[in-house]
Amino acid sequence: MWTILLFCVPVIYGELYPDFCPLAVVDFDVNATVDDLLLFDISLSKQCSDDKIRHSAVAAMTDNAFFFGNSETQIETDFGKYLAFNCYQVFSTLNHFLFKNFKKTKGLMKRYDKLCLDVESYIHIQIICSPFKSFIRLRRMNETGISPRILETTFYLQNKRNSTWVAIKNYLGEDDPFTYRIWHTLTHAKNFLINSCENDFNQLFFWQRKYLSLAKTFEATFKQGFNPMIEQRNEQRYRTNNIDCSFSKFRQNGVKVAVCKYTGWGVSGFGSLEVLQKIKSPFGEEWKRVGFNSTGAFTPLYGSDVLWGLIFLRVEMTTYVCTCTNKNTGTQIQVTLPDVDLDLLDSEKTSSNVFVDMLCYTLIAILFLAFVTAVVLLGVSCLDGVQKVLTWPLQHIQKEPVSEKIINLTNLMFGQEPLPKKESLKQQCL
């Protein structure tokens, strides 16, 4: 009983921490395939109007991302934040080297301020680890375009046996001491980064499975298993779309949910979401703000960012509006959740499925009866044909006694007349 209480209390608040940062997991069999992938996605952003620098992180196992968030807000689970920001070697090394030094060094801050060509600029790092490959990409970019403008450095582990380290440098004309400092530091630390990637992969795989086994409450497992970035094709969704903002409702594990997505370059840093629900009160209709049950940001390797928020539809037949806001420009986009009754649609779908099943069974029975009838008719016709073939010679061949044939043959040899044919009984009667 006490064990259940000890587990349930931290899970409800999303603070299921291990007592220590996970060390090398040697007693756990990692049955990883080529498709298994660990993704660390860390970025630094700074608005030109202030001196505050924010850094964020994404930690994902293959396509099941269990943490989206930044250092200031609790997104998804504190457990994921704890692992991402404190325990993993590659993340901690690059995070400390880039972000912590930026906060402390005035010279680097001045250099970084020169990047502020627009409202906000970024330094973006992507770390991909797997048992068979490692991939680290470092990019500096600004809001004026999706493609990197100043620096793009890529490290790729080409051959695991001899640890061939392939580097792609694209400085685009920038002669920056800090750029070369990053390059030389990561180059000298290539073996450490390779080993750290493999170690981090094993650790994350182990602790993710262990955490899922401990998180017994419904909402905890729901958050861990849900990823709106990967939409199942066989899942029926009812949505309203905008160029940048969309609002959809569907069922997830038997629960009615709605997800609002804000799509665009950099929205994970400067975007915000808000969902309002129309309620009736004694003074008329009012709009009430609805808190998200789960939120997050997604930064793909290529393409636009996605900021999403999920709510449970406890009161379905009401009006929900999602507002996607660009905090830099103040631009807002509002979309309304489709007015669709999922229960009614499910009942109609069930009844239609029953009708389709009955129709299928009826057609199958008709086809089976037709097949049996055709086989019977074919068998009867075959038997009738065989009978006719067997009786045909008996109907057309005349039967003569052997003695008469011999006498007639003898008479013909000696020039005598053959015996007269016997008249039939009918002719004799006439």
Swiss-Prot record:
Recorded GO CC terms: host cell endoplasmic reticulum membrane; membrane
Transmembrane segments: 363-383
Protein location: Host endoplasmic reticulum membrane
Keywords per UniProt: Glycoprotein, Host endoplasmic reticulum, Host membrane, Host-virus interaction, Membrane, Transmembrane, Transmembrane helix, Viral immunoevasion
Modifications the protein undergoes after translation, according to the UniProt entry: N-glycosylated.
Main location: host cell
Range of residues in the leader sequence: none
Membrane-protein topology: Single-pass type I membrane protein
Lumenal topological intervals: 1-362
Positions bearing carbohydrate: N31, N142, N162, N293
Domain topic, free-text comment: The ER-lumenal domain associates with class I MHC molecules and is responsible for lysosomal sorting.
Function: Binds to MHC class I molecules in the endoplasmic reticulum and targets them from the Golgi directly to the lysosomes. Once in the lysosomes both proteins are degraded. In consequence, surface class I molecules are down-regulated and infected cells are masked for immune recognition by cytotoxic T lymphocytes.
Family to which this protein belongs: Belongs to the herpesviridae U21 family.
Listed name of the protein: U21 glycoprotein
UniProt source species: Human herpesvirus 7 (strain JI) (HHV-7)
